[in-house]
Amino acid sequence: MEGISITKLLVIAVLIVLLFGTNKLRTLGSDLGAALKGFKKAMNDETPAAKKSDGAEAAPRVENKE
């Protein structure tokens, strides 16, 4: 099996540009970039439930005795 060649990828890219137009693709890329930026920001922000309170200590570690 050959896979997808460069010429096939170029033909697919040209068809996509012809179907959607450059303006629609530009707005789609912009919207996708904004969505990814928002997702990354949400993943990096700590939620209040994930923060440890000042008075709380970690539970002692329990090991199995056999």
Swiss-Prot record:
| Compartments (UniProt record) | Cell inner membrane
Any one of the GO CC terms = TAT protein transport complex
- Where exactly are the transmembrane stretches of this chain? 1-21
Membrane topology recorded in Swiss-Prot or TrEMBL: Single-pass membrane protein
Keyword check for Ribosomal protein: no
- State the UniProt keywords alphabetically: Cell inner membrane, Cell membrane, Membrane, Protein transport, Translocation, Transmembrane, Transmembrane helix, Transport
Report the superkingdom from the record.
Bacteria
Which family does the record assign? Belongs to the TatA/E family. TatE subfamily.
Role played: Part of the twin-arginine translocation (Tat) system that transports large folded proteins containing a characteristic twin-arginine motif in their signal peptide across membranes. TatE shares overlapping functions with TatA.
Against NCBIfam families, the record matches this protein to:
PRK01614.1 (NF002448), PRK03625.1 (NF002960), tatAE (TIGR01411)
- This protein's name: Probable Sec-independent protein translocase protein TatE
UniProt lists the gene as tatE
